[in-house]
Amino acid sequence: VLSVKISVSPVTPLVDQKLHQEDSKQFPYLCPMDFKRRRLAVTLRNQLNYPLQFNPFVFSKLFLLWVAVGIVGGVIASFYWTVLESLLHYLSQFQGFAVIPLMTVAGLLAGLIIHFLGDPGEMDLIVNNIRFKGGRLEPKNNPAMILSSWICIASGGSAGPEAPLVQVVGSTGTWIARKLRIKGEDLRSLSIAGMASAFTALFGAPLGGSLFALEIQHHKHISEYYQALMPALVASCSGYVVFILLTHIGIGPTWVFPIYSTPELNDFFYAMLYALAGTAAGWLFILTVRQSRSLFKKLRVPIYVKMTIGGLLIGTIAYFVPLSRYFSHDELNVLLEQQFTLKFLLILLGAKILAIAFTVTSGWRGGFIIPLFFVGATVGLVVNAAFPGQNLPLIMVSCMAAINACVTRTPISTTVLLATLTGFHHFIPILFASLTGFFLAPKTPLINAQLGIKE
């Protein structure tokens, strides 16, 4: 029996020729067909030893990892949202004067949770960790973040679930990366992918959520972590599908805006003009938050005392202006469906800005993106009431885009998010308004970590 030993090293044409000559001398009876089979076997062995050459597709193991992070994020977001909806339904029974003691006690309970389980931080800390700690978000703070944010949001705080979910899902991406011994930029990309998955689950916009997770990292540059864009997009898409399947929340605009007429060339200029009002509201919001933060920092008391005081203040505002309660996910539709006087809208605007400021500076957990959209919509209604006969959908969406871009420094993702959330599919006027708010924003951003200064 003839035995032929197959080498696993790569075979070049020169080596092929030498092997053929040696085989011809040693085995004169070896036919050309046997040599071809031998060369084919060596070629197949080499392809198996180099899987990247064997795989004809673009996707790799990292692609599957991005999908897995998105699926895990979708499951976490679904669980969080389901529990939050149940708590909102139960605590919404407290109306009138009962809101004040409810939110005061809620602040105390959430503060005690943070005091004993540890401070999970806020969006500022998340951005700081992504930028200066290699993208590592600590999962050990998740229990405190989940429990305290459930209480704060469900009782009526003017902050949404986006910030808690970003921390929880983003840190889950970090945990997965550590378990798989992934380091460097790949670890940071997985954390950002988790953040994008959380944003997308709440906003229902995979592209907008991915861009927001990147833009929020810097006050000027969207592309600082451009290598994380593809992981963020993949995780967002897989997470969004899982979230929709588990919650049955539906696909479509979150807020039903009036039908927008056929766009005209002047609409771009009007969008920038209306955006000035939204930008002014953004300045007012930033100044109010900074003043409130300064006041609470002067209180040398434990976190649960600050949060109790914050709950008392927010509850008092909610008692006098009930529409300012909660994070405005459903309340914005009330603005669109009912008619209000100019006086009431001005009162609501001031009350909501104060409520958000007291919420985020007293230690209450939650994000201010959706509440900011509510403030922008209110500003749009104020402009329309003061100058009737204008294009109401364009006014509202322009003010919403401008104030969010002014405060969060995210003009591109804000444009995509609003087009998805409102069903306002005329993209360019929103972009003009977002850029107006971005370039007229204060030089120092509200989120200090966006400046690139390590804290």
Regions found by a protein language model. Name each.
Residues 1-15, 24-25:
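Short, low-complexity, charge-dense intrinsically disordered segments
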